[in-house]
Amino acid sequence: MDSKSRGKSRLNRSILTLVSFFGLVLFYLTWYLYTRGLTGADSPGCRIVYMGPSYARITAFDESHTKFASKYSLYLYREQGRDPLPDENEGFKHLGGIPILFIPGNAGSYRQVRSIAAETSDIYFDHYLDQPDGLNPNAKNYDFFTADFNEDFTAFHGRTLLDQAEYLNEAIKFILGLYANSEHPPRSVVVLGHSMGGVVSRVMVSLPNYIPDSINTIITLASPHAAAPLTFDGDILKIYSAVDRFWFQGYDNKETDNTIAKIAKERLSKISLISITGGLLDSILPADYTTLGYLVPPTNGFTVYTTGIPGVWTPIDHLAIVWCAQLRRRVSNALLEIANFDSPDKTYSLEKRMEIMRKNFLSGFEDYTSQDKVAYDKPADHILLKADSQQINFVQEGQKLKVTPGKMPSPLNVFRLPSPKVSKVQFSLLSSMDIGELKSDNNEGYTQPTLLLCNTMDAIKEDANIIDFTNKETTEIVMFKCIDVRDDSNMIPRSAVGTYSLSESSIGGDKSPFYAIQYNSTILKQYDTVIVTGSLGMESNDNENFLLAELSDYNSSQFNIHEDLFSLMTRGAKFSLPLDKPLSMNIKIPGAWSSILAYKLKVSWPEDRETTEYIPVFRTFIRQWSNEPYEVKWHVNIEANNQVLLNMHGIAPYTPFKVKSKEEYGLNIEIWTDSIPDKSLTTIRLRIDLLNSLRLLVLRYRLATISFCVSIILLALVFQVKHYKETNKFPTFLYGLSCICSPWVFGSILFTLSILTPIMSIKPLQKFLNVIDPVVLQDSNEINLSLTDEFKLNSFFLGLEEKSLWFIGPVFFVMGLGIVSLTFYSLLVAGNVIASISRVLLKRLKLSQTEKKQPNPGKLWANRRIIGVLFVLLVIPIYMPYQFAYVVSCIIQSIQVIKILVADKTNKSILNYHLSLLMLMLWVLPINVPILVVFVHNMTINWTTPFSSHHNFLAILPVILLMERYSNSRTLPKMSQTKYKVTQAFLAYYVFYCLVYGIRHTYWIHHLFNLLCCWLLVLHYDAQDDTSDHVQ
């Protein structure tokens, strides 16, 4: 090697060291930020729960009903002191409630049903048993059934997921049979699924053994509907693809002659599906994966985040979502409200169920909930109101009505609504007390505020039921025809002095929440007057009570920040709010629509604000919101913490999103503030927080670690093979990595990765990549694209829609380079340590020369290897998964490397080659481990049925044969120019596949490695034939 080559080599090594160090620092920083606790609206706030659980196993559900009876079990939950326990003699013949089935998730327990089941029983027996007014008169307690899957790994193994779905369909048939002797036997059950249990519930409906109409309501908790969380198993992806297609066809409005589509329409038409997700606190599953997307229309379901559910207002981690006190209260209330014991389905109609679900799980500010508002329906029951014009306080547009204890401007405060043709207006009301009912028997001294939407009348019949606000001194009468809209009030978190967390006013909190109502012109156009009446109670000692109401111009309450994503990233956004700002203002940020970016908002006030004599009745708070999915977060007491970290779930990698203007996906910030007269919020600054954005990459790109690291190892092999072809010496793996870091190569790689992000979202290119994907070529039903043109799905490379995030690819590559370098050095150190210990042990054994020269030991070992290979190839097709053989192959290769290290004088080329091969095998290993975990788990529970998938011995045969051939420490044979080009072309395609397809089709990385081993075998046998011909 000349001095110029040595200089380049030293430069490459220096760059490699620098880049690897930077990559490891970046990786550590990302992991540190991910494990650091969350604050503000993203901090945990669940309360502890208590219950008295008991479980009765239903032994009658045995092999005569299902072939899975020896593996799975069915239980009935009973709350001690509440639910009657089954009699030993009568068994389950006299069940009197409504059947509901709980499905645990990946490695979940049947006992996880206890929290929601206990709360449902408590609410029913404490509140519903006597059927008081205001509660569902047709409600009945639920009989909670739950499946014991022995903590099966449904996220790892597609066949296991199908087994569970098939078992549960048979379980539902059995459960309904338990009620056969009831006076009104049910024909369906409610399904409650956690994690992968929610996916199982969707699979159930698509199977042949599904009983028509046996499921009509599904509630899922943190269930990955939009995408499979792990892609180590091809069966999982096939199931997702088939089930998604079934559900899409079931709700597709297009006429079709397809038999499966017709079946899907019949089965799904009356099913409601609600997907509840815990948001950012879920450290196991990306919350983006829980969206329903194009699978379920708004008439049949929606996705909602727990941060926006009234009274919950907290993100919830993956396991806590089944026991969180606030959420279980909401879920239990919803279950009891949809119950209709008089119906054969034991629930109300789809329309009423959806209305109940929207009221229980959505914040009430969404346009989607307008259809459920009293003001929207304009009910037939009206309130006729007779008022004294002298007692009316007319509140002008833009003027705030302020009511505090004992201080009511007038018994009747009236907002006159302009014609919608003249101007669009918005009415906002905020109160520390719930909106009360206006009663006809008492028109004085109301202790709760009342809100009415009215139309002015000319006359009222004398015999009509009138609420009269007039007296003997009244000279001018004004008459109104009104509706009471108290049911339209939305519970929101308290934001006052001394309030620092959302949990303080959530369900079970020490402080009372606030209540708000907001109407736009779409609803207000039906009326000409808004009336606020009632006081906050003269006798009230709570001086913190208040009511604020305002009618404002709609346009004055809407602001747009026009900066795009690139502008927000580079310079941020800054703006000031007007002096005459309304009670609530919505700020739309069209450029902020990415799920993998965090945003920092800073609110600043004038310096002299604290010196003013005006005392706000509440502290400024922010409602952060977005639609599809419905995500709301509340940031309270902004004065105490004026810097807010905003995380959102908008357009996310690998999940379908509706094709529409990006502005419609933008983040919305609604600021509620009690304005100081003639003062203004000085500035609001918004910028992208790149540091906190790093933590958002972990869950969404955990599989990218494998694909990027494998691609880097393969790139190193490309340069190693090139050097071997030129010099007939196989260089070290470090040489391959240093070649990657040569300035020209490294720059080219970073440039390529940078342009991959923007071009991979181009639709024609996506269609082409889909066509040439070997997974799609194998099965045309497994597509990487959305099933409908109304939605878009980015499945390739990093799955990004944001062209401004071109740098994410290079960042991952730098991280991967650091991880691969660390892996190599760790492997080398571990190998040398083990080799040194082995050499010492061999010396101490003091083997005699006679023992060393035993006749033909190699032949004996060769025979054993052949027997071992034959045994493995025999058991794989009938019992063991091929992943077991791969793990054994990795162990064999590790031993092979140690043997080479022990033989200190061995040719370095052999060591370098085998060490590089071991690096590749070890990074492919994680793809195979999950299936092996499922296999071992089945063995531990004495599930004697042979493993039902992954028995293709061809998927491992080349690997086994190559390991057997390398038992004598061989290296690559000499290659002709043609074979060299084929080898390099295959390695290049392998790199391409890992980067473009590898994250969502990870399991195919193993199959490509298997093909690589097959090609290496061809090279060896061809070289052997050439040698034989030469000898002859």
UniProtKB/Swiss-Prot annotation:
EC number annotated for this UniProt entry: 3.1.-.-
Keyword Membrane on entry: yes
One Pfam family this sequence matches: PGAP1_TMD
TM stretches of this protein: 15-35, 703-723, 740-760, 805-825, 861-880, 884-903, 916-936, 943-963, 985-1005
Glycosylation sites: N12, N520, N555, N784, N907, N938, N942
Alphabetized Gene3D superfamilies for the sequence: alpha/beta hydrolase
A biological process from GO: protein transport
Known function: Involved in inositol deacylation of GPI-anchored proteins which plays important roles in the quality control and ER-associated degradation of GPI-anchored proteins.
Protein's recorded name: GPI inositol-deacylase
Organism of this sequence: Debaryomyces hansenii (strain ATCC 36239 / CBS 767 / BCRC 21394 / JCM 1990 / NBRC 0083 / IGC 2968)
Taxonomic lineage of the native organism: Eukaryota, Fungi, Dikarya, Ascomycota, Saccharomycotina
Gene designation: BST1
